[in-house]
Amino acid sequence: MRIAAGVGQNKDVIEAIEKVDFEVFKVESEEELVEYLFNGFADAAIRGSLSASKIMAKLREKYSDKMSRASFIELDGQKFLLAPVGIDEGDDVDQKLLIAEAGSRFLLSLGIKPKIGVLSGGRPQDKGRSKKIDKSIDEGNLLTSILIDRFIDAKHYFILIEDAITDGANFIIAPDGISGNLIFRSIVLLGGGKGHGAVTLGMDEIYIDTSRSNDVEGYKRALEFAHYLVKSSER
Protein backbone atom coordinates (compact mmCIF):
# COMPACT_ATOMS: atom_id res chain seq x y z
CA MET A 1 0.00 0.00 0.00
CA ARG A 2 1.29 3.45 -0.95
CA ILE A 3 -0.25 6.73 0.16
CA ALA A 4 0.74 10.06 -1.38
CA ALA A 5 0.80 13.21 0.74
CA GLY A 6 1.06 16.73 -0.63
CA VAL A 7 3.72 18.93 0.91
CA GLY A 8 3.23 22.66 0.48
CA GLN A 9 3.91 25.57 2.81
CA ASN A 10 2.79 23.77 5.98
CA LYS A 11 5.67 21.41 6.77
CA ASP A 12 3.72 19.74 9.60
CA VAL A 13 2.75 17.21 6.92
CA ILE A 14 6.33 15.89 6.90
CA GLU A 15 6.32 15.35 10.67
CA ALA A 16 2.94 13.60 10.41
CA ILE A 17 4.34 11.24 7.75
CA GLU A 18 7.16 10.29 10.12
CA LYS A 19 4.64 9.38 12.84
CA VAL A 20 2.65 6.74 10.94
CA ASP A 21 3.68 3.09 10.56
CA PHE A 22 2.80 2.64 6.88
CA GLU A 23 4.35 3.82 3.62
CA VAL A 24 3.72 7.44 2.66
CA PHE A 25 5.60 9.30 -0.03
CA LYS A 26 5.84 13.07 -0.34
CA VAL A 27 4.55 14.94 -3.39
CA GLU A 28 5.32 18.62 -3.98
CA SER A 29 2.95 19.52 -6.82
CA GLU A 30 -0.77 19.23 -7.42
CA GLU A 31 -0.22 17.74 -10.89
CA GLU A 32 1.97 14.93 -9.56
CA LEU A 33 -0.46 14.10 -6.76
CA VAL A 34 -3.37 13.65 -9.16
CA GLU A 35 -1.22 11.78 -11.69
CA TYR A 36 -0.08 9.25 -9.07
CA LEU A 37 -3.68 8.81 -7.94
CA PHE A 38 -5.05 8.28 -11.45
CA ASN A 39 -2.30 5.95 -12.70
CA GLY A 40 -2.58 3.74 -9.62
CA PHE A 41 0.92 4.38 -8.28
CA ALA A 42 -0.73 5.70 -5.12
CA ASP A 43 -3.54 3.71 -3.50
CA ALA A 44 -4.77 6.90 -1.84
CA ALA A 45 -3.73 10.52 -1.49
CA ILE A 46 -4.17 13.34 0.98
CA ARG A 47 -3.98 16.96 -0.05
CA GLY A 48 -1.65 17.92 2.78
CA SER A 49 -0.97 21.62 2.32
CA LEU A 50 -1.13 21.82 -1.47
CA SER A 51 -3.76 23.95 -3.24
CA ALA A 52 -7.28 22.53 -2.91
CA SER A 53 -8.62 24.44 -5.91
CA LYS A 54 -5.84 23.22 -8.22
CA ILE A 55 -6.27 19.61 -7.17
CA MET A 56 -10.06 19.72 -7.47
CA ALA A 57 -9.76 21.29 -10.93
CA LYS A 58 -7.53 18.40 -12.02
CA LEU A 59 -9.88 15.81 -10.51
CA ARG A 60 -12.87 17.41 -12.23
CA GLU A 61 -11.21 16.95 -15.61
CA LYS A 62 -12.04 13.25 -15.13
CA TYR A 63 -15.11 13.39 -12.89
CA SER A 64 -16.87 16.57 -14.03
CA ASP A 65 -18.90 18.36 -11.35
CA LYS A 66 -20.29 15.29 -9.58
CA MET A 67 -17.61 15.36 -6.89
CA SER A 68 -18.03 16.81 -3.42
CA ARG A 69 -16.23 16.62 -0.11
CA ALA A 70 -17.49 15.38 3.24
CA SER A 71 -15.44 16.08 6.36
CA PHE A 72 -15.02 13.25 8.85
CA ILE A 73 -15.28 14.83 12.30
CA GLU A 74 -15.06 13.49 15.84
CA LEU A 75 -16.68 15.50 18.63
CA ASP A 76 -16.99 14.27 22.22
CA GLY A 77 -16.61 10.68 21.09
CA GLN A 78 -19.20 10.91 18.31
CA LYS A 79 -18.06 10.57 14.69
CA PHE A 80 -19.94 11.99 11.74
CA LEU A 81 -19.60 13.29 8.20
CA LEU A 82 -20.27 16.94 7.42
CA ALA A 83 -21.05 18.18 3.91
CA PRO A 84 -20.93 20.26 1.84
CA VAL A 85 -17.68 21.83 3.02
CA GLY A 86 -16.31 23.15 -0.26
CA ILE A 87 -17.37 26.79 -0.50
CA ASP A 88 -18.52 26.24 -4.09
CA GLU A 89 -20.53 23.09 -3.32
CA GLY A 90 -24.15 22.42 -2.33
CA ASP A 91 -25.71 25.58 -3.74
CA ASP A 92 -29.11 24.02 -4.51
CA VAL A 93 -31.30 21.03 -3.65
CA ASP A 94 -30.05 18.98 -6.61
CA GLN A 95 -26.43 19.36 -5.52
CA LYS A 96 -27.22 18.56 -1.90
CA LEU A 97 -29.21 15.50 -2.99
CA LEU A 98 -26.21 14.21 -4.96
CA ILE A 99 -24.01 14.79 -1.91
CA ALA A 100 -26.47 13.09 0.46
CA GLU A 101 -26.82 10.04 -1.77
CA ALA A 102 -23.07 9.76 -2.44
CA GLY A 103 -22.30 10.10 1.26
CA SER A 104 -24.93 7.50 2.11
CA ARG A 105 -23.36 5.04 -0.33
CA PHE A 106 -19.96 5.77 1.20
CA LEU A 107 -21.20 5.03 4.73
CA LEU A 108 -22.94 1.84 3.57
CA SER A 109 -19.70 0.70 1.92
CA LEU A 110 -18.13 0.84 5.39
CA GLY A 111 -21.02 -1.09 6.94
CA ILE A 112 -22.57 2.00 8.55
CA LYS A 113 -26.29 2.79 8.22
CA PRO A 114 -26.67 6.45 7.22
CA LYS A 115 -28.63 8.71 9.55
CA ILE A 116 -28.83 12.12 7.91
CA GLY A 117 -29.44 15.40 9.69
CA VAL A 118 -30.47 18.13 7.26
CA LEU A 119 -29.82 21.73 8.36
CA SER A 120 -31.33 25.00 7.17
CA GLY A 121 -31.24 28.69 8.04
CA GLY A 122 -33.83 28.98 10.79
CA ARG A 123 -36.45 27.34 13.00
CA PRO A 124 -39.88 26.46 11.54
CA GLN A 125 -41.41 29.56 13.12
CA ASP A 126 -38.82 31.78 11.43
CA LYS A 127 -40.51 31.48 8.06
CA GLY A 128 -41.56 34.89 6.83
CA ARG A 129 -38.66 36.77 8.40
CA SER A 130 -36.80 36.99 5.09
CA LYS A 131 -36.83 35.46 1.62
CA LYS A 132 -33.40 33.95 2.25
CA ILE A 133 -34.57 32.17 5.40
CA ASP A 134 -37.75 30.97 3.67
CA LYS A 135 -35.76 29.56 0.76
CA SER A 136 -33.34 27.74 3.05
CA ILE A 137 -36.12 26.17 5.13
CA ASP A 138 -38.09 25.17 2.02
CA GLU A 139 -34.98 23.54 0.54
CA GLY A 140 -34.38 21.66 3.79
CA ASN A 141 -37.95 20.37 3.81
CA LEU A 142 -37.76 19.32 0.16
CA LEU A 143 -34.39 17.59 0.51
CA THR A 144 -35.54 15.67 3.58
CA SER A 145 -38.75 14.59 1.84
CA ILE A 146 -36.86 13.31 -1.21
CA LEU A 147 -34.38 11.37 0.93
CA ILE A 148 -37.17 9.73 2.93
CA ASP A 149 -38.95 8.82 -0.32
CA ARG A 150 -35.72 7.11 -1.38
CA PHE A 151 -35.66 5.08 1.86
CA ILE A 152 -32.81 7.02 3.44
CA ASP A 153 -33.12 7.80 7.15
CA ALA A 154 -33.26 11.61 7.24
CA LYS A 155 -34.65 14.34 9.47
CA HIS A 156 -34.79 18.11 9.02
CA TYR A 157 -33.27 19.72 12.11
CA PHE A 158 -33.61 23.25 10.73
CA ILE A 159 -30.89 25.41 12.36
CA LEU A 160 -30.51 23.15 15.41
CA ILE A 161 -27.27 21.33 14.64
CA GLU A 162 -26.86 20.51 18.32
CA ASP A 163 -30.05 18.42 18.22
CA ALA A 164 -28.83 16.53 15.16
CA ILE A 165 -25.59 15.60 16.92
CA THR A 166 -27.38 14.68 20.15
CA ASP A 167 -29.76 12.42 18.20
CA GLY A 168 -26.82 10.53 16.73
CA ALA A 169 -26.93 11.75 13.13
CA ASN A 170 -23.83 10.43 11.36
CA PHE A 171 -24.12 12.63 8.27
CA ILE A 172 -24.86 16.35 8.61
CA ILE A 173 -25.99 18.22 5.49
CA ALA A 174 -25.31 21.96 5.85
CA PRO A 175 -27.44 24.57 4.01
CA ASP A 176 -24.55 25.23 1.59
CA GLY A 177 -20.79 24.87 1.29
CA ILE A 178 -20.00 28.19 2.94
CA SER A 179 -22.08 27.27 6.00
CA GLY A 180 -20.52 23.81 6.06
CA ASN A 181 -17.01 25.23 5.91
CA LEU A 182 -17.78 27.60 8.78
CA ILE A 183 -19.26 24.73 10.83
CA PHE A 184 -16.13 22.67 10.19
CA ARG A 185 -13.82 25.51 11.25
CA SER A 186 -15.90 26.26 14.35
CA ILE A 187 -15.91 22.63 15.51
CA VAL A 188 -12.40 21.52 14.51
CA LEU A 189 -10.23 24.64 14.54
CA LEU A 190 -11.90 26.39 17.48
CA GLY A 191 -14.18 23.99 19.35
CA GLY A 192 -11.91 21.09 20.22
CA GLY A 193 -13.32 18.65 17.68
CA LYS A 194 -11.00 16.35 15.75
CA GLY A 195 -10.87 16.47 11.97
CA HIS A 196 -9.86 13.33 10.08
CA GLY A 197 -9.86 14.99 6.66
CA ALA A 198 -12.60 15.20 4.06
CA VAL A 199 -13.33 12.23 1.82
CA THR A 200 -14.00 13.14 -1.80
CA LEU A 201 -17.30 11.63 -2.92
CA GLY A 202 -18.19 10.81 -6.51
CA MET A 203 -14.84 9.38 -7.62
CA ASP A 204 -13.33 5.89 -7.72
CA GLU A 205 -9.96 6.77 -6.22
CA ILE A 206 -9.44 7.62 -2.54
CA TYR A 207 -8.58 11.29 -2.07
CA ILE A 208 -8.69 12.99 1.33
CA ASP A 209 -8.81 16.77 1.44
CA THR A 210 -7.18 18.48 4.39
CA SER A 211 -7.04 22.00 5.75
CA ARG A 212 -3.86 24.02 5.34
CA SER A 213 -4.50 25.09 8.95
CA ASN A 214 -4.03 21.53 10.25
CA ASP A 215 -1.38 20.68 12.81
CA VAL A 216 0.73 17.52 12.89
CA GLU A 217 -1.96 15.46 14.60
CA GLY A 218 -4.59 16.63 12.11
CA TYR A 219 -2.48 15.49 9.16
CA LYS A 220 -1.69 12.22 10.96
CA ARG A 221 -5.40 11.52 11.41
CA ALA A 222 -6.00 12.21 7.71
CA LEU A 223 -3.24 9.76 6.76
CA GLU A 224 -4.72 7.14 9.07
CA PHE A 225 -8.19 7.74 7.57
CA ALA A 226 -6.81 7.22 4.06
CA HIS A 227 -5.03 4.06 5.22
CA TYR A 228 -8.26 2.77 6.78
CA LEU A 229 -10.23 3.40 3.58
CA VAL A 230 -7.67 1.53 1.46
CA LYS A 231 -7.75 -1.43 3.86
CA SER A 232 -11.57 -1.38 3.84
CA SER A 233 -11.65 -1.39 0.03
CA GLU A 234 -9.46 -4.51 -0.01
CA ARG A 235 -11.87 -6.57 2.09
Task: Annotate the PLM regions.
Residues 1-165, 170, 179-235:
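Anion-binding alpha/beta catalytic cores of soluble intermediary-metabolism enzymes, centered on
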